Amino acid sequence: MNIVQFLASFFYRIRYWLLWGSLLVTALVIYFTQFLPYSYTVNSSLYAGVTNGTNLDGSQLININSTFDNIINIGKSKNTLAKVSVRLLATNLVHGDEWKDNMYIQAKHYRQLVQILPKEVLALVDRSSLDKTVTNLMNYRKENSSNFVYSIFNRPYPFYSYNALNSIIIKRLGTSDLIELVYTSADPGITQNTLKILEDELLKAYEQLRFSATNSAIAYFEEQDRK
């Protein structure tokens, strides 16, 4: 009997062991991978329009690179992310469903949130008005470790904490007027809405920067007129 015949005979004898072994391994892989957390990544681009700044006396009124740095730093700042945390919390409390996934939050994550939510905070939720709920939570928030809205941001909670939100990538796309935002989390709705909320905060911040620059330009021309 040559080696080929020997191997063929050997594998034929253990064919059932191989079959059941393969099925067992497949079943174990399927079973254990169901407990692995899914992750969802969302990319978003924000148009800044910074390079359209006005030149005065040969020098730019708005330093382009500095302005982009300011916008990015604002987006990464703790103050901005705290606002995102409150608005995200309000959004999920208003739209969450205990038994049905939706575009805002998965049911399991809503249940986890409600389980740790104090009754006094739940009483602040107005399901008919997101803006009112945001205002209520903002007014309730105090810099105190016993304050739920404050602590959920400053402790390692998923989705709403500084650690979670600080993982958002904010960068300028090359030399373009686009700012790219990239975020990954375990909930598709939360991932997408987190970026939407942050984009809104960045747009507000940029409008303030532009308003400040416009005031500087007006002051410059007024000064020139007085000379």
Whereabouts are the PLM-identified features?
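Hydrophobic and amphipathic membrane-targeting/association helices
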Residues: 1-227
